[in-house]
Design a protein with these regions (language model features):
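Electrostatically charged, flexible surface regions
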Residues: 32-155
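Charged helix-capping and loop-helix junction motifs
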Residues: 1-4
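Glycine-rich phosphate/pyrophosphate-binding loops
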Residues: 7-33
């Protein structure tokens, strides 16, 4: 959600910073602990607002789900990746008698990469991650160029 919105802003040439609050999936929606974001928000944002940002880049900030006094500091991190394993489809009938389908992703234990945002959050830090919009996988360019080099036309 927040990173998607920041991507749209960056594509439009707007300085883009995504602010996200981490929270436990259990009891989701009951109470989200915004203490860390409230106490640390200005400290995190000031340097980001004062610095120059390269075109087509954005910043992703994640606040841990802990009390503000327990935050250990701020880490500049790499982007981490969750492995959600296999999805499942849950079928049900709504109160009006219509069928519905939920597609669920089941989080599995993760081992966050070193210097990743996931590691920082797990360790009690606020993560600040610079992201870029050029998603080109440079290492594959030569391989793909070689695979298509012999083709001269559509025929």
């Amino acid at each position: 959600g927040t990173v998607s919105a920041a991507i749209e802003g960056a594509l439009a040439g707007v300085r883009a910073i995504a602010l996200s609050q981490v929270y436990a999936r259990e009891g989701m929606g009951d109470s989200v602990p915004f203490e860390a974001a409230e106490a640390w928000g200005a400290k995190v944002l000031r340097p980001l607002l004062d610095m120059d940002m390269a075109p087509r880049t954005l910043i992703n900030v994640n606040f841990p789900a802990i009390p503000a006094a327990e935050v250990k500091g701020i880490r500049v991190t790499r982007q981490g990746f969750h492995d959600y394993g296999r999805g499942s489809i849950v079928e049900g009938i709504d109160p009006r008698g219509y069928p519905y389908f939920w597609f669920g992703l089941h989080g599995i234990e993760h081992s966050p990469g070193h210097d990743s945002d996931l590691e920082a959050i797990d360790d009690g830090y606020i993560s600040v991650t610079p992201l870029q919009l050029d998603l080109t996988h440079d290492a594959s360019l030569a391989t793909l160029r070689g695979a298509y080099a012999a083709m001269k036309s559509a025929g």
